[in-house]
A protein has these predicted regions:
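S-adenosyl-L-methionine-dependent DNA methyltransferase catalytic core
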Residues: 40, 66-220
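Buried hydrophobic packing segments
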Residues: 5, 220-221
């Protein structure tokens, strides 16, 4: 995808360009991947600047850190001054974005998973489960290192949602509704990504979740 983007920049020679990616791109392959990307665009006649922005400080009810890269054509570098937007002085929380959300379908939990998630309080995760249930639910992950706070995670109303993925109920990145024992609905997913309720998604339920999870949050964009 990067190579195709670079090809387009080479052919079009825009005054400026922007691309977005996960923050892990900076450290991928010990930084060599991002270095290659930087050198490629520099060889095309662009000066790059980059910054990590967290969506929850830009009106999005979600902790979603993204790498935002700006390229400015060298012949315009003294004529164009780009400043990243200033963050809000507070995080946007789930309660702020899910008021009066329209009803819509969701992918229900299995009965086994539902019984496990019913034991988790808002803001909690697998750590709040009885030890025997946590071991049975997590399997080998129970004995692995790291916090694994995404497993059996129920979001609190008073915090931003964790980063949405392309599926609402993956075991390693659970995002359970604060009050109801279920994943977020399609419209809740969209609200958390700051899409307006008028925005329509098409395809199967799983395809709609994927479209929303892959998107750049509207308010951040």
């Amino acid at each position: 995808l990067f190579a195709e983007f670079a090809r387009c920049v080479k052919e079009v020679q825009p005054k400026m360009f922007l691309f977005e990616n996960v923050r892990g791109l900076l450290s991928h392959d010990f930084g060599r991947t991002f270095s290659t990307i930087t050198h490629t665009f520099e060889s095309l006649g662009y000066t790059l600047q980059h910054k990590i922005l967290n969506a929850c400080y830009y009106g999005v009810g979600q902790k979603r850190q993204r790498l935002i890269v700006i390229g400015i054509r060298n012949d315009l570098i003294n004529k164009i001054s780009f400043q990243y937007p200033e963050p809000d002085d507070h995080m946007t929380i789930l309660r702020d974005v899910l008021k009066n959300v329209p009803k819509s379908p969701y992918q229900p939990y299995s009965e086994t998973k539902r019984k496990v998630m019913e034991l988790v309080p808002p803001g909690g995760c697998w750590i709040d489960l009885p030890t025997d249930i946590a071991k049975a639910y997590m399997g080998k992950s129970y004995y692995s290192g790291g916090g694994r706070r995404g497993m059996a995670r129920r979001i609190s109303w008073d915090e931003p949602c964790l980063t949405l993925t392309t599926s609402p109920s993956q075991k390693q990145t659970e995002r359970c509704h604060p009050d109801e024992t279920r994943p977020f609905t399609v419209r809740e997913y969209a609200r958390i990504q700051s899409f307006p309720d008028s925005w329509e998604f098409t395809g199967s339920l799983s395809e709609q979740y994927k479209q929303i999870g892959n998107a750049v949050p509207v308010e951040l964009a």
